[in-house]
């Protein structure tokens, strides 16, 4: 992937692949994943369950507002919800095992460019059009960004770049930004 600009800028950057979750379910893993953070507000007010701004040490035990935890590796989730979490992913890869279909979706990316991955867990929590409470999917979104909070937050000081992880990149005219990612479907 190549990005070219016509004026100097400092911007967040990310990819937005989204995968459906089949009826037979799926298991998510992010090898090498380290600390993570829950979106700082309810993604879908009154529906989201994770603790806004909460820390995640393990994807299988994300803290909820009611004091319980939610396993984000076993999909679909057991409740209607919409969630965003950002995980440090220094290995630049994620796997989505879809056992009933006998496949694994393997995603790899340049972790030097995209040090984190945002997981968008859409689990029947949005009832407005076009989702209508039927959308069951996961976005596995490599980023150099502070969630999807925009340029001013990502390019400024924020809790993610305070940990030493870039949340924006500098782009210059005449100097293309080149990166790569790969999505593969593997038979089990």
Feature-to-residue mapping (PLM):
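A short, structural micro-pattern
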Residues: 11, 22, 132-134
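Short solvent-exposed strand-capping/beta-turn motif centered on an Asx-Ser/Thr pair
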Residues: 4-8, 186-188
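Short, flexible loop/turn elements at secondary-structure junctions
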Residues: 5, 17-19, 144
């Amino acid at each position: 992937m190549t990005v070219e600009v016509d004026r100097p800028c400092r911007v967040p950057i990310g990819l937005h692949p989204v995968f459906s979750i089949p009826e037979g379910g799926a298991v998510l893993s992010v090898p090498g994943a380290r600390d993570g953070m829950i979106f700082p507000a309810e993604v879908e007010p009154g529906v989201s369950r994770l603790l806004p701004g909460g820390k995640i040490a393990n994807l299988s035990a994300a803290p909820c507002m009611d004091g319980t935890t939610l396993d984000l590796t076993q999909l679909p989730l057991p409740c209607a919800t919409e969630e965003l979490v950002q995980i440090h992913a220094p290995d630049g890869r994620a796997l989505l095992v879809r056992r009933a279909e006998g496949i694994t979706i393997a995603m790899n990316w340049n972790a030097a460019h995209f040090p984190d991955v945002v997981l968008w867990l859409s689990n029947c929590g949005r009832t407005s059009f076009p989702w209508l409470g039927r959308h069951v999917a996961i976005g596995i979104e490599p980023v150099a960004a502070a969630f999807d909070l925009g340029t001013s937050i990502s390019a400024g000081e924020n809790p993610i770049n305070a940990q030493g992880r870039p949340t924006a990149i500098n782009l210059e005219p005449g100097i293309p930004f080149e990166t790569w990612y790969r999505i593969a479907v593997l038979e089990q």
